[in-house]
UniProtKB/Swiss-Prot annotation:
Protein name: HTH-type transcriptional regulator MntR
Keywords: Activator, Cytoplasm, DNA-binding, Manganese, Metal-binding, Repressor, Transcription, Transcription regulation
PROSITE patterns: HTH_DTXR (PS50944)
Species the sequence originates in: Geobacillus sp. (strain WCH70)
Function field: Central regulator of manganese homeostasis.
Lineage of origin: Bacteria, Bacillati, Bacillota, Bacilli, Bacillales
Amino acid sequence: MPTPSMEDYIEQIYILIEEKGYARVSDIAEALSVHPSSVTKMVQKLDKDEYLVYEKYRGLVLTAKGKKIGKRLVYRHELLEQFMRIIGVDEENIYHDVEGIEHHLSWNAIDRIGDLVQYFQEDPKRIETLRNIQKRNEQAEE
């Protein structure tokens, strides 16, 4: 199992490859706000653990294992962002909140959150009911 830090790198590499067709050390460093030397060390570790193949000065490619995990990590992140929007978290807090919790949830919890997101999406009236409850609670706090 990858560590939370490894997950961040795999997720970002997956996103870069999906968007640009490639992922360079400099692109990864910029996206994660870390030094290129840190990226190189992590990429070497990910290569050793067979999440990707890295050739110095030639770039990197995710292995089947890396692609599978990368896809699942992106799904987890996007699902948690959807969940935060549904439950009414302020947009400016969503990314930071998701980054704070995504590594601490089991895949079972992620699957159950997915069920809940689906439940709300299948009937928009459910979201409307939730918003009404939130408004009532906010008014009661005033």
